[in-house]
Amino acid sequence: MKLNALTLSLLSALALPALASASTANLTVATTTNSRDFPLQADEPLVIPLTKGDYTLTISGIGGDCPPAPEQEIKFNTPIALNCHVPTQLPLSIRFTGDYAFQWQAQNNTLTFVRQTTKAAKTEFRRPIPNVSCEVYQGGEVTLDLASSFADGTELQDAMTGQVVTVEQGKVRLTPSANSGGLVLLEPKQTAKAEPKQPFTYRNANIYFVMVDRFYNADPSNDGSYGRHKDGQEEIGTFHGGDLKGVIAKLDHIQSLGTDAIWLSPIVEQVHGFVGGGEKGSFPFYAYHGYWTRDFTKIDANFGKDEDLQTLVREAHRRGIKILMDAVINHAGYATLADLQQDAVLVVNAPMLPERWNDWKPSADENWHSFHQAIDYQSKNWQQWWGPDWVRAGLPGYPAPGSSDITMNLAGLPDFRTESPQAVTPPQWLLNNPGTRVVSKPNYTVADYLIEWQSDWVRRFGIDGFRIDTVKHVEGEVWQRLKQRATESLAAWRKDNNQSGEPFWMMGEVWGHGAYRSPYFDDGFDALINFDIQKRMDNGAACLSQMAMVYRDYAQTLAKYPDLNPVSYMSSHDTELFFGRFKSLDMQRNAANALLLTPGAIQVYYGDEVAREAGPYADDFHQGTRSDMPWEWNAERQALLKHWQTLGQFRQRHPAIGAGDHREIAQSNAYVFTRTLGEDKVVVAFVGR
């Protein structure tokens, strides 16, 4: 949620006076597809590497009193006035890749931007834990006043410790767990191990996001499919071997977290070869992540076979877990050497390359971008590729990319012409692709094919829902049609397989969208990823009562809009890992408290539950967020995992957590609230740190 001055003044008025947080200055550097934020220290320069391109800078967390900053442009070595209490947003265009310094002068509240003349040493950003006012737990027994929530004689059980207490004279007395981060989770005793009193609702969904390639390799026989290589270095952008069989093998682990749905990164066939990784071309970058599609109708061999997906759906459903596939409709994958050779697209100077083009490696004076020297980007033979009736691309005879969200080439990827009413035929190389299900259909448009290819996964396998990539870059009418077609496909699959369940569910990614209702919900979306909460997690992990305003705001908004469902997260593949911010297992545990008690659905990124470390990333930071899932844990991480399991299962037992009425209970020594949905009622207490 972007905050304006009015919103901030209202939130300030609602905040608990005794728990006002200290100001924490923050710089967010964002592109159209990802972002990263950094702590700003007064009078200490922040040096970060930036590649050529356009960015949006947001400076927030500045306290004090100051006049509103005027409209201004960023100029080198020129102080820029900042707002107090209201974020300052500035466009930034970088012409030359390099290291850049941001100097915040707290005394006069300005930011100065400087290009570093020498390369700065690589810095690990570890934030100081926010200095916020917070309740303090002195140890021993605590007394909680619950007279307004439960009648005398009611037996309650703390999910964290297993203690059973009885409400007497409106109060309960118990000793919190020393390892819970000050958290007490009270539920009626008879429901502590029982089925939920309310049916499942996606507003309480706990969604586990798996990047399939980096999760678990259960079938090494499919590694290196299509002639893909390791690089023998840090393996930043290569396939690591994770597959669908690996997800199946770890379903019990996923279930133990109270998971309701698994969001799989895209598993359809990806481009076979590499492109250069990072601005400097320092590593070969393959489509291990799944967002560079070659064929939308088949599973990539690195990830497995149809039988594996069938088994995964069956075994997940047996555990009460739904399967969400990641659907990409905005763009196709890059033209790599491997694909150009296989598909006989005659735009390459073959004598410059080895017999198998994907075996190419840069020489000592080249980098991984240098393969472009063998490709003729002015050749008329590019018509043999996707073709100008299918995509926008900077190629001869193709429609030029535009500047709008709909017509731009996102990250230089070929942009499907989903708005075109023209009937098209799939390119010949795709019709000839081994194992493809693509067939030419009379009078089909680009959007017709893409909708059919995506919904066919639902019809064949009983997929429960989609996570939709890059929503704002495709027309709303296309999303409405996809939702209708997928809904019909799931109903047909269930009829054929004698099954029932919730209607097809669609979650969208609209970059920067917060926990509010927007017209995107009229385009078939049941939920949107909530980009608002990630930075609020810092203070919430430092002290849970700092989430009071967030919880109150979200719960009120959910009550006002019955079709609204924000999906909140703390880590993602396009931003950062929460653990990387503080490198603190205690903060990771406390962040679980803040996230899993948030109204609305929540998303756990694989490894959040064991504080997964970032991997190597060269000059592309977001590669580090896709590190391999660790499967061996020391005692401290096992304790962290146990905490996530206890909290996740508590949330799963009680749909009131995500979907219920939220009401605070005033206490002198704790932050306490109830969540109620029909007969389902729980009390959450934070007694301090």
Predicted segments with their positions:
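Structured interaction patches on ligand/partner-binding surfaces of diverse proteins
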Residues: Q41-A42, I62-R95, D99, V132, ...
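Short Pro-Gly-centered beta-turn/loop motif in secreted/extracellular proteins
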Residues: P45-T56, I62-G63, T123
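Structural recognition of the beta-strand scaffold that forms the well-ordered cores
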Residues: N206-M211, A261-P266, G290, D295-K298, ...
